[in-house]
Regions:
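Non-catalytic alpha-helical scaffolds and adjoining flexible linkers that form interface surfaces
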Residues: 1-19, 24-237
Length: 237
């Protein structure tokens, strides 16, 4: 039987001793019932936990509204990530964002790869500057904007198309030049870093690069990103 890889985003108690698991895969979101998964001694318990990557098999159900996860193998339980309370809370918020966004994304494969990259990078933190781990969720939030169809413009001034544009306008949806900037825009040296995090390919956003990013830039870029989500998606992060 062919196994499907996915990451469990959310679980809900179902009937007396079962769960509904909401799982992100490269093909989208699956809602599956896992029988006897509330029983600590059940073989189904380990592979039906939130924030767990699993390989699993599905059986179509004729009686229930949900298909059934009949077997599973834990690929990664992200133990290192779960040990730290602050990190876990950070990821919990990220999981909620991905869960709310997934039905509005067309490229599920890219979303899955992005989420998988983020969890793996944080769980196996290889950064010398450990505090910079906060940049990984920021990378996901920035790249998710593109997948949701509201990505900011970094290719020249959003107003006049000039190439020399180093400020960011939330109102205009991208970078602006010195001639088009307003008092409401962000003129900061960190816009270039924001562009790298947004446009950079995942295989290029390696620990060596993340180590070099000034920690002070995080607060500025996160503020811009959060306000951007609120304006264009009505999502308050």
């Amino acid at each position: 039987m062919e196994l499907i890889e996915g990451i469990i985003l959310k679980t809900i108690k179902y009937q007396e001793n079962s769960k509904l698991c909401y799982i992100i895969t490269k093909d989208g979101l699956l809602s599956l019932m896992v029988r006897a998964s509330l029983d600590f001694h059940s073989k189904n318990f380990s592979y039906s936990q939130e924030l767990t990557k699993v390989d699993f098999a599905i059986t179509k159900s004729k009686k229930n509204s949900f298909d059934i996860m009949t077997s599973g193998i834990v690929v990664d339980s992200y133990l290192n990530l779960k040990k730290d309370y602050d990190t876990l809370m950070m990821i919990t918020k990220l999981m909620d964002l991905v869960y709310k966004s997934i039905n509005y994304v067309n490229n599920f494969d890219n979303l899955y790869k992005l989420f998988d990259y983020t969890l793996d990078a944080i769980n196996n933190n290889k950064l010398e500057t450990k505090d910079n781990v906060v940049f990984y969720p920021l990378i996901l939030k920035l790249k998710l904007l593109y997948l949701l169809g509201v990505g900011p413009n970094f290719n020249g001034c959003t107003v006049c198309k000039r190439e020399n544009a180093h400020a960011f306008s939330i109102e205009r949806g991208g970078v602006v030049c010195d001639k088009c900037i307003t008092i409401f825009d962000y003129k900061t040296e960190y816009i270039g870093i924001m562009k790298i995090l947004y446009l950079g390919k995942l295989d290029k956003l390696v620990p060596e690069l993340i180590n070099e990013i000034p920690r002070a830039s995080f607060q500025v870029i996160e503020e811009i990103t959060n306000k951007y989500y609120e304006k264009y998606l009505s999502i308050k992060l």
